[in-house]
Curated annotation (Swiss-Prot):
Residues 1-38, 116-136 are annotated as: Disordered. GO terms for cellular component: actin cytoskeleton; actin filament; bleb; cytoskeleton; cytosol; muscle thin filament tropomyosin; ruffle membrane; sarcomere. It comes from Homo sapiens (Human). Residues 1-284 form a coiled coil. This is Tropomyosin alpha-1 chain. It is linked to Cardiomyopathy, familial hypertrophic, 3: A hereditary heart disorder characterized by ventricular hypertrophy, which is usually asymmetric and often involves the interventricular septum. The symptoms include dyspnea, syncope, collapse, palpitations, and chest pain. They can be readily provoked by exercise. The disorder has inter- and intrafamilial variability ranging from benign to malignant forms with high risk of cardiac failure and sudden cardiac death. Cardiomyopathy, dilated, 1Y: A disorder characterized by ventricular dilation and impaired systolic function, resulting in congestive heart failure and arrhythmia. Patients are at risk of premature death. Residues 12-38 have a biased composition (Basic and acidic residues).
Amino acid sequence: MDAIKKKMQMLKLDKENALDRAEQAEADKKAAEDRSKQLEDELVSLQKKLKGTEDELDKYSEALKDAQEKLELAEKKATDAEADVASLNRRIQLVEEELDRAQERLATALQKLEEAEKAADESERGMKVIESRAQKDEEKMEIQEIQLKEAKHIAEDADRKYEEVARKLVIIESDLERAEERAELSEGKCAELEEELKTVTNNLKSLEAQAEKYSQKEDRYEEEIKVLSDKLKEAETRAEFAERSVTKLEKSIDDLEDELYAQKLKYKAISEELDHALNDMTSI
């Protein structure tokens, strides 16, 4: 009997230990599931962040494309401005040549005017000296007056042409200044676009590095998930084994209880037989 009780106590203790191990295995399983769920949530979050990074990359790619288009447009404007400057330089050269020719004509007209004035003076002196040749002198004087008028007309025309050339030169200089300002603005815009392009390129490199970092983290998380999945499978296997052990122990306890009950019945029967025997002996 003592051996049976001791064995039952040991079996109950084994049962309690098995139940404790099963509960611990269940707790490990739940913790592993929670960790797996947390890692899945982190993975989803990282995927969202990666999607956001890809969206930003697309946005910066569009910005880079716009910057390149603006740069090409600025280069075209700068080229057009340079062509305008070259055209203006050619026009200025032509105007300067025309001005030189006008100045030469003006100098010739002034020289003729001076000669005509000298001739007029000589004519006046000749009129005083030789009155007998008045008619001839008058004709000569008329010719000289006509030449004088022509010289004055040439001089006036040269003055007008000179003023017109000077006015055109002022307009051309103003156009040249505006063209130079446009060229300077185009150069400044090109510099700004180049700086913006550098910034976009640096941001793009930073985003590529960040995406690479996210990819490395994702690989590391996948590895951790795999390890935790293996641990979860191992915990489930241990839990199943513990449950089978508990089932076996419970069956063993049930068998021992049945055997104990049978022994009690047998002991009761033997006790009754002994009582009957004692009663019979007492009756005798």
